Swiss-Prot record:
Source taxon at top rank: Bacteria
Similarity annotation: Belongs to the bacterial ribosomal protein bL19 family.
One Gene Ontology term, aspect cellular component: cytosolic large ribosomal subunit
Biological process per Gene Ontology, one example term: translation
Protein name per Swiss-Prot or TrEMBL: Large ribosomal subunit protein bL19
UniProt function note: This protein is located at the 30S-50S ribosomal subunit interface and may play a role in the structure and function of the aminoacyl-tRNA binding site.
Record keyword Ribonucleoprotein present: yes
Keywords assigned: Ribonucleoprotein, Ribosomal protein
Pfam families, alphabetized: Ribosomal_L19
HAMAP family: Ribosomal_bL19
Length: 116
């Protein structure tokens, strides 16, 4: 491990990030600053992809808002991300669900993963 990797590893916070992946429905609590006030805004949707790159890890969440698709990419270890909740685990066979961008309504549903 070189010095850059060691430094990045030491900078990763000890906060517990839940295990999630593509297909999971997430609630992301984001800190939003409006003027002098700061509040928590919740963004709920399906995780369509995750990039694991140590401190620079990100994930993308997609939801349909008023008939329009909205995607947001969040850094996993950002101080702006207050909390990540996993609502349900989806059963998918792909790591990136970019094909959901062309689907709406029932066609964009994802089966729930069951642990029997």
């Amino acid at each position: 491990m070189n010095q850059v990797q060691a430094f990045e590893q030491s900078m990763i916070p000890e906060t517990a990030v839940p295990k999630f992946g593509a297909g999971d429905t997430l609630k992301v609590h984001v800190k939003v600053v409006e003027g002098t006030r700061e509040r928590i805004q919740v963004f709920e949707g399906v995780c369509i992809g995750r990039m694991n790159a140590g401190l620079r890890s990100t994930f993308t969440v997609r939801k349909i808002s008023f008939g329009e698709g909205v995607e947001r990419t969040f850094p996993v270890y950002s101080p702006r991300v207050d909390k990540i909740e996993v609502i349900r685990h989806g059963d998918v066979r792909r790591a990136k669900l970019y094909y959901l961008r062309g689907r709406t309504g029932k066609a964009s549903r994802i089966k729930e993963k069951r642990d029997w």
